[in-house]
């Protein structure tokens, strides 16, 4: 499909009641966009990193009762899975779109990565004020990257077994960067460029 951008309808899909109905909306309306966006960004990251990257689209197969509050694509160097590795995400809650560099609770090197970021503060200090962080990919709550929550979020990521750290940028449903498609791709590439130094540091 030709990607024309994300619309308010995509956010409304994440409000559809019921597991079956919401999953139908995600599969029919959002995942084709994820495939189109993800293929472009996977190619972009592969070239930028000099390493083959692979696209994964969340299937939410473990859900049997409650519909997913968010849905996403992930881009990772591992073809078999992304959750235990540093990876990039583009996804939606019902009230914002996110572009993250994500370290979720399955990551096996959380302490090492958190300590590196805590020690090398310049890596995160150079991020734009428009960027945000999240301590939990399942929750909508985010914080501006420079508002004082960064250190405690990294410490929680290091010290708590299911701690997480996500950093990137969020967009409200009426943000002009979400469409047309070429504008969103350009914006996403800009965000990824800012996150690549962190990604490389996490892999060291």
Swiss-Prot record:
* Pfam families referenced in this protein's UniProt entry, alphabetically: DUF1054
Which Gene3D superfamilies does the record associate with it?
A: Protein of unknown function DUF1054
Q: Which HAMAP family match?
A: UPF0637 (MF_01851)
The similarity annotation says:
Belongs to the UPF0637 family.
Q: What is this protein called?
A: UPF0637 protein lwe1043
Source species, please?
Listeria welshimeri serovar 6b (strain ATCC 35897 / DSM 20650 / CCUG 15529 / CIP 8149 / NCTC 11857 / SLCC 5334 / V8)
Organism ancestry: Bacteria, Bacillati, Bacillota, Bacilli, Bacillales
């Amino acid at each position: 499909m030709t990607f024309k951008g994300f619309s308010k309808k995509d956010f409304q899909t994440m409000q559809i009641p019921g597991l079956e109905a919401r999953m139908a909306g995600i599969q029919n309306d959002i995942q084709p966009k994820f495939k189109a966006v993800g293929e472009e960004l996977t190619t972009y990251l592969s070239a930028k990193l000099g390493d083959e990257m692979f696209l994964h689209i969340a299937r939410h197969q473990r859900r049997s009762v409650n519909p997913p509050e968010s849905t996403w694509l992930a881009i990772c160097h591992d073809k078999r899975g992304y959750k235990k590795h540093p990876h990039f995400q583009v996804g939606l809650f019902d009230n914002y779109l996110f572009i993250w560099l994500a370290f979720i609770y399955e990551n096996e090197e959380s302490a090492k990565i958190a300590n590196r970021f805590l020690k090398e503060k310049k890596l995160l200090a150079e991020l734009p004020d428009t960027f945000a962080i999240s301590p939990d990919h399942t929750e909508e709550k985010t914080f501006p990257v420079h508002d004082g929550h960064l250190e405690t979020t990294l410490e929680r990521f290091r010290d708590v077994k299911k701690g997480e750290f996500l950093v990137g940028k969020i967009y409200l449903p009426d943000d002009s960067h979400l469409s047309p498609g070429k504008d969103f791709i350009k914006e996403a590439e800009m965000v990824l460029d800012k996150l690549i130094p962190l990604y490389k540091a996490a892999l060291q």
